[in-house]
Amino acid sequence: DPDILKLFGFGHRPDPEGTFPTITDDDDRDAGHGTLLIRQAPELLFLERCIDWLKPGGRIGIVLPKGILDNRTYINYRRWMLSRCKVDAVVTLHKNTFEPDTGVRTCVLFLSKPLEDDPVPGDYTIFMAQSRRVGKDSKGEPVFALDEKGSATSELDEDLTQIAEAYKTFRDIGTFTESETCFTAERGELDDNLNLNPQHYSPELNATLEKVSKFDDKPDWSVTTIGQLDKNIRIYMGPRWSSRSLVV
């Protein structure tokens, strides 16, 4: 609905520099460099409005589709968000978190808006976590932790409690014991894509990649990407693996 989209900066195309129009004039909401879109993802409009309505000095936790964190088509939206808020924490959720109702991969963003006269910090530490156990299966049935004998206990097999405790410690004293689940990244070290996906900064994953890259230093060994082997190769996951575009 154009009457709704024109109320949002995200309802318009960004300019060549990647900025969105500021919507201030009730009588001419489509003024400026932005071109009104035909449609827009509701979650992006929701994100914009949440940040707009957040008072200076306020904090917010918001559940969003995981793709917002690193999808290249969303880079301008991430840039807009980072220019207005400090990202306190990013937590990616297990695929069963909202099952059996939906299997959409989601994340939680914790944002804080600086006081009115304060700029958004240029560099700071971001708490990051990857939830790998949510205490239930895809049907919504509980999954319990096992004891040392392999028998089910009365405790759910989940790591959200651990993540919450680590984040509380991080907020209270500015540090915590990092693990495969919880770690940090620096705002100033975000790549050109402004990637906010914790997986990209996982110590476990990066240690593995570093081990693989060392093979490049060995005689008769070479490390390269699949795309460098054949530019026509496409990789699909799940049921799309049998696509004609896939080279195995």
Place the predicted regions along the sequence by residue.
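Short loop segments at secondary-structure junctions
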Residues: 112-116
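Non-catalytic DNA-recognition/assembly elements of restriction-modification systems
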Residues: 166-238
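Conserved Class I SAM-dependent methyltransferase catalytic core
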Residues: 19-97, 102-104, 108-111
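Hydrophobic alpha-helical scaffolding
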Residues: 36-40, 67, 150-157, 216-219
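Short glycine/proline-enriched turns and hinge-like loops at secondary-structure junctions
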Residues: 100-104, 120-122, 242
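DNA target-recognition patches
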Residues: 1-25, 195, 199, 219, ...
